[in-house]
């Protein structure tokens, strides 16, 4: 991750794909996937206690990122923090798993002295492959300490290191995600949106004033510390954040498609990109949809670069002119003309006792937010089903390719094997771009690509071209073979994949084109092939420059 102008490509375009087979699910080698529990157990810190308690929290997955440079020297990974630390187990007891990230897993943990619960992110040191990986972990901890004391930034309690892991103990955010809370409330107003935006932009202002760019702002990275307090919002996940100096230019492509600023796509940006992203979040808060939307990832990029904002469709005719003025200023495509975080906080619509109306927004906006959040969850689950249901005949070519790359016949492709294999297939990718693909396909965060991961990656990135894949997924959900997917069947599938089943009614409504309360095959295909859940310019398929059929 560069602080200077060296051209690298670091994108989160597989964040959604990673969730397709996994946010919480893992796959194993064979042609048959292993269980999620077994795979997860393989990456748990030694001494982890059995699951206990029911406190809820989440740690947004680290972005799939592209690394530069040579492998990390052994002395670096042996001593990531650069100084000795006490043993984590002397002070905390690990509990149940809360979330899975790019480099590690977050657990509930309890302070042995006080009984207070915290969240502990355990980062597997074996996944810190390059010197930049090690520097990223150090910098994340440094930035969390640097921002300590801000009431809307998750508080770090301490960092610990043992031979296998780096552990970051932090404040537990048990209130859930921002959008989930909005949906739960059932009522939302411009004034409430102004209050939340004031918090989000306040975090940005604090970061920028302390020389930090967050670079990964999105609703999932704002959690509520307390489910009973709508304003207990906390910014989390500083894994992509960087220190900056005034005038410094960054070229790393990071972010998610809906939220990425145009100058990030152009690989020349600074702290202004955070304000753009906050503007996108505000637009979604008020309308339930992102301002830059298209059926494909490239279409989204084109829309972002074009910068045309829709204020004509519902509900915008009844949204205040002041709100629209603020959004226009936050989404100014010219970074130097965009409002700064401080200027946003001084805008009449957002400041204390400002002009934001208190009347409830159209209920349709809440519905759209629910659909925007829930639909991806079903797609992700379906993609895993497809990857695990392929027959030997269907994947014979891919299996041979996997075997050709797996030169030591270990059942997993290492970074070096992938790099050599890509070049054998005529790829001209830079090492950093290959690293990005490696991390994208490694859904179980093992540091290698196993058989099912390879198949799942090529299937997803091939945009589900084979109809039989879709038939297999549809049949999986259609438990009774009726030709329709019902809410009950989706609930059962969610249980099987350890996924939340909230808002499935909204998934049905979104896909149900004939309004009969269920999803037929045609509607399912339309849902699965609409849009794209990932972002990025490189895929395993087009990088190999061969047919994946």
Swiss-Prot record:
Sequence positions that bind Ca(2+) 4: 512, 514, 516, 518, 523
Residues annotated as the enzyme's active site: 216 (proton acceptor)
Binding sites annotated in the UniProt record for Ca(2+) 3: 478, 480, 482, 484, 489
Keywords assigned: ATP-binding, Calcium, Kinase, Lipoprotein, Membrane, Metal-binding, Myristate, Nucleotide-binding, Repeat, Serine/threonine-protein kinase, Transferase
Record-listed E.C. numbers: 2.7.11.1
Any GO MF annotation of the entry: ATP binding
Reaction(s) catalysed (UniProt annotation): L-seryl-[protein] + ATP = O-phospho-L-seryl-[protein] + ADP + H(+); L-threonyl-[protein] + ATP = O-phospho-L-threonyl-[protein] + ADP + H(+)
Compositionally biased intervals (Low complexity): 52-64
Protein's membrane topology: Lipid-anchor
Region Autoinhibitory domain: start-end pairs: 356-386
Protein localization: Membrane
Keyword Ribosomal protein: no
Ranges for domain EF-hand: 393-428, 429-464, 465-500, 501-534
Chain residues that bind ATP: 98-106, 121
Binding site for Ca(2+) 1: 406, 408, 410, 417
The protein's name: Calcium-dependent protein kinase 5
Record gene name: CPK5
């Amino acid at each position: 991750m560069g602080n200077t102008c060296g051209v690298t490509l670091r994108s989160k375009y597989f964040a959604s794909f990673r969730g397709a087979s996994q946010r919480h699910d893992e796959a194993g080698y064979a042609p048959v996937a292993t269980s999620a529990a077994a795979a997860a157990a393989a990456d748990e810190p030694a001494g982890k206690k059995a699951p206990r308690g029911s406190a809820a929290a989440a740690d947004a997955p680290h972005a799939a990122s592209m690394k530069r440079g040579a492998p990390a020297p052994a002395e670096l990974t042996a001593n990531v923090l650069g100084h000795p630390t006490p043993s984590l187990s002397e002070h905390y007891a690990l509990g149940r798993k809360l979330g899975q990230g790019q480099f590690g897993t977050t657990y509930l943990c309890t302070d042995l002295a006080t009984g207070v619960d915290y969240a502990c992110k355990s980062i597997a040191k074996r996944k810190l492959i390059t010197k930049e990986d090690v520097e990223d972990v150090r910098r994340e901890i440094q930035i969390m300490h640097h921002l300590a004391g801000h009431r809307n930034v998750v508080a770090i309690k301490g960092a610990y290191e043992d031979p296998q892991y780096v552990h970051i103990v932090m404040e537990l955010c048990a209130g859930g995600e921002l959008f989930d809370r909005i949906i739960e409330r059932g009522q939302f107003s411009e004034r409430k949106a102004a209050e939340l935006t004031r918090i989000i932009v306040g975090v940005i202002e604090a970061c920028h004033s302390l020389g930090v760019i967050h670079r990964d702002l999105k609703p999932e990275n704002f959690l509520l510390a307390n489910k009973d307090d709508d304003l207990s919002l906390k910014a989390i996940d500083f894994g992509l954040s960087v220190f900056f100096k005034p005038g410094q230019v960054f070229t790393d492509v990071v972010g998610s498609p809906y939220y990425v600023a145009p100058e990030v796509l152009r690989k020349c940006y600074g702290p202004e990109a955070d304000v753009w992203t906050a503007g996108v979040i505000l637009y979604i808060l008020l309308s339930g949809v992102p301002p830059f939307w298209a059926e494909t990832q490239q279409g989204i990029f084109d829309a972002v670069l074009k910068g045309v904002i829709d204020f004509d469709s519902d509900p915008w005719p009844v949204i205040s002119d002041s709100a629209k003025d603020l959004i226009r200023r936050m989404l100014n495509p010219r970074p130097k003309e965009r409002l700064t975080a401080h200027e946003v906080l001084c805008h009449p619509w957002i400041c204390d006792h400002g002009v934001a109306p208190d009347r409830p927004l159209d209920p349709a906006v809440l519905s759209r937010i629910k659909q925007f959040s829930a639909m991806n969850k079903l797609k992700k689950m379906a993609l895993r089903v497809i990857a695990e249901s392929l027959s030997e005949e269907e994947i014979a070519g891919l299996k041979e390719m996997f075997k050709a790359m797996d030169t030591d016949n270990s059942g997993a492709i290492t970074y070096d094997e992938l790099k050599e294999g890509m070049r054998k297939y005529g790829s001209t990718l830079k090492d950093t771009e290959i690293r990005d693909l490696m991390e994208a396909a490694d859904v179980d965060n093992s540091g290698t690509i196993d058989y099912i991961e390879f198949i799942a990656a090529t299937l997803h990135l091939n945009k589900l071209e084979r109809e039989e894949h879709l038939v297999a997924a549809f049949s999986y959900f259609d438990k009774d073979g009726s030709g329709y997917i019902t809410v009950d069947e989706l609930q059962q599938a969610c249980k099987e994949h350890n996924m939340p089943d909230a808002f499935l009614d909204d998934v049905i409504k979104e896909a149900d084109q004939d309004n009969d309360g269920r999803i037929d095959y045609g509607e399912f295909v339309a849902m699965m092939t609409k849009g794209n859940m990932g972002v990025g310019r490189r895929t395993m398929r087009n990088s190999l420059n061969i047919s994946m059929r």
